[in-house]
Every structure is written in C-alpha cells, then in structure tokens.
Curated annotation (Swiss-Prot):
Source lineage: Viruses, Duplodnaviria, Heunggongvirae, Uroviricota, Caudoviricetes
Keyword Electron transport (UniProt): yes
Co-factor remark: The D1/D2 heterodimer binds P680, chlorophylls that are the primary electron donor of PSII, and subsequent electron acceptors. It shares a non-heme iron and each subunit binds pheophytin, quinone, additional chlorophylls, carotenoids and lipids. There is also a Cl(-1) ion associated with D1 and D2, which is required for oxygen evolution. The PSII complex binds additional chlorophylls, carotenoids and specific lipids.
PANTHER family: PHOTOSYSTEM II D2 PROTEIN (PTHR33149:SF12), PHOTOSYSTEM II PROTEIN D1 (PTHR33149)
Disulfide-bonded cysteines: none
Keywords: Chlorophyll, Chromophore, Electron transport, Host membrane, Host thylakoid, Iron, Magnesium, Membrane, Metal-binding, Oxidoreductase, Photosynthesis, Photosystem II, Transmembrane, Transmembrane helix, Transport
Organism: Synechococcus phage S-RSM2
Binding site for chlorophyll a PD2: H196
GO biological process per UniProt: photosynthetic electron transport in photosystem II
GO molecular-function term, one example from the UniProt record: electron transporter, transferring electrons within the cyclic electron transport pathway of photosynthesis activity
Primary residence: host cell
Protein name: Photosystem II D2 protein
Length: 351
C-alpha cells in the first residue's frame, strides 16, 4: 500500500494528464482532442454566427445571412474584401483594431473559420493516428483522411494565396461554393484540366467500387443458421468470414472475366482510388493558384475563327467561358467597377 502511494506521488503531472486524456470513455479525447475540439467548436460556431447575423454587403455587395433573408442554401460566411489582401485579419489587428462589428464587416469571420477549420481537420487526422496507435491497428484511416485535408487546404488556403487576396477563395456556403465552381470554369477552364479529370475518376470510381463491394458482400452472406459460425448475428470472435469470397470471385470472374482474389488488394484498391482522386484534385488546384493553364487546343480555335462551319465541343466551351468571364466579373467583383462595351459582350443564340 505504501509502495503504491509512493508510486502515485512520484508520477509527474504529464503522466497523470496522459492517463486522463487516453482514458476509455464514450467520446475519446486524447492529445489530439486538445487541438480538435476547441478548433472545431470555434470553426462551427463562427460559421453559425456568420450565416445567421453577418452581412456580405461590405465585401461582396451581397446579402448572405438569415437576418437579411437568405436561407440555408444561400447563406454564407463570405471571404474578406479584396483590399484586405492576404492579411490574417486578426480581431486585434490594424484592420479591425479590436472592433468586433468592423471585423465582421471586413470578412474577419471567414479567416477565423478557415484557420480554425484547417486545424480542426488536422486534429481529426491526428485523432485517428492516436487511436490507431492505442488499440494497435495500422493508421490507414488517418492516411486516407489526408485526402479531404489536402482538398480543403488547397482550395481554401493555397488557391487564394496564389491570387491577389482571400477574396477569391470560396465563401463558406452552398450557393457560394457553386459560384466558386463557375469561377474556376470561366477563368481557369477547370473541367478540361487533367487533374480535375483524375479527381472525378477517383471520386466516382470510389463510389462505384463502394457500391460493387457492398452488394457483393450482401449477395454472398452465408445463409443464417444455428451453427457457431452462421447464427443469426455477427460475432466478433467467429472463426470464419461472414461472406464467401470464393463465390464472389466466381461471380465477378463470370461477369468481367477478371476479379479480385485477394481481400487485402481489394480493400487497398478501394482506399487508393478515391484518395488519389482527392490528392490529384488538390494538385490541380495548386496549379490554378499559380494560374497554370489546362489544355489549349489552339489549332481548333484558329480554324473555328476562320471557318464558320467548323465548331467542336472544345471551341463551344471556350466561348461559354468567355461569356462566364464577361458576365460574372462585373457582378462578382463590384469593387472593380468593370464596364464592358456592348459590342464585346457575348450574345445568346436567341439574340
């Protein structure tokens, strides 16, 4: 008894805190939780505050809050004014000077949500690393989650850092994200970018693989019985697999002429496809931050300009992009006071 008390007394505060953080509880905390929970709480709270009360009139000339009449699809926490450049927009910084209302008007909430959101995602990834380490499994969950982190950081942070200001990042809202997608298409021809193509293939391919895998397992479940390994429930200690890999292999071999014969390769492939899609999309967005162009089929553009009867889907899309730029820019960037003469504006076929 005395020895145990001495042991407890000799333990430092770090060991005591370590034990408390890693204690088995309903919601695991861990060291990663010290980063995750405060930053996630502040990011979500900042977003809810902004979408409820804060206008975008001073930054975008828009109404963007429930208080102004926006709904869930049109409300947003908008990016800071273009004049703010890449300032961190700290509440106590030279722009707001501690004035909370002025800070909100300048777009400080966006910087607040973006910064804390990025750290929250990193905290969630570290949480998966930490828990995997504690229970003795491999860290592929955390590695896979690097995909969403890469997309968030590239889209919300790296892209605007490559442009003139935070203004050109996406605002945090549904319709605001759609505006950003149209902007990427009109100004960067994003859909023709090979990294976007790889991203689409990865995400849709991952969804397809997930659906195929799910139905295959469902289709090859053992018939329920009363035996130890096939009773009407799942037992974490059962000796055999719950579904028949052999039957699944035979089925897909007949359908496609080829099938996975190894579970590890199958599941790694299901991990690899969507994560690579996210990574390649992120690389593409970094390219856009540097204003790198996608494919330019100049020969088709030259021929289309010389021959009125020659047009391809590519040349049609280029014209659509010109229309997007001409009509989007004056509305999207009202502070620039763009005025385009009528003769250079695109006209629809009906006109």
């Amino acid at each position: 008894m005395v020895a145990s008390n001495l042991t407890l007394q000799q333990r430092g505060w770090f060991d005591v805190l370590d034990d408390w953080l890693k204690r088995d509880r309903f919601v695991f905390v861990g060291w990663s939780g010290l980063l995750l929970f405060p930053t996630a709480y502040l990011a979500i709270g900042g977003w809810l505050t902004g979408t409820t009360f804060v206008t975008s009139w001073y930054t975008h000339g828009l109404a963007s809050s429930y208080l102004e009449g926006a709904n869930f699809l049109t409300a947003a926490v908008s990016t800071p004014a273009d004049a703010m450049g890449h300032s961190l927009l700290l509440l106590w910084g030279p722009e707001a000077q501690g004035d909370f209302i002025r800070w909100c008007q300048l777009g400080g909430l966006w910087a607040f949500v973006a910064l804390h959101g990025a750290f929250a995602l990193i905290g969630f990834m570290l949480r998966q690393f930490e828990l995997a380490r504690l229970i003795g499994i491999r860290p592929y969950n955390a590695i896979a989650f690097s995909g969403p982190i890469a997309v968030f950081v590239s889209v919300f942070l790296i892209y605007p850092l490559g442009q003139s200001s935070w203004f050109f990042a996406p605002s945090f809202g549904v319709a605001a994200i759609f505006r950003f997608l149209l902007f990427l298409q009109g100004f960067h021809n994003w859909t023709l970018n090979p990294f976007h193509m790889m991203g689409v293939a990865g995400i849709l391919g991952g969804a397809l693989l997930s659906a195929i895998h799910g139905v295959t397992v469902e289709n090859t479940l053992y018939q329920d019985g009363e035996q130890a390994n096939t009773f009407k429930a799942f037992d974490s200690t059962q000796e055999e697999e719950t579904y028949s890999m052999v039957t699944a292999n035979r089925f897909w071999s007949q359908i496609f002429g080829i099938a996975f014969s190894n579970k590890r390769w199958l599941h790694f492939f299901m991990l690899f496809v969507p994560v690579m899609g996210l990574w390649t999309s992120s690389i593409g967005i970094i390219g856009l931050a540097l204003n790198l162009r996608a494919y330019d089929f100049v020969s088709q553009e030259i021929r289309a300009s010389e021959d009125p009867e020659f047009e391809t889907f590519y040349t049609k899309n280029i014209l659509l992009n010109e229309g997007l730029r001409a009509w989007l820019a004056p509305v999207d960037q009202p502070h620039e006071n763009f005025v385009f003469p009528e003769e250079v504006l695109p006209r629809g076929n009906a006109l």
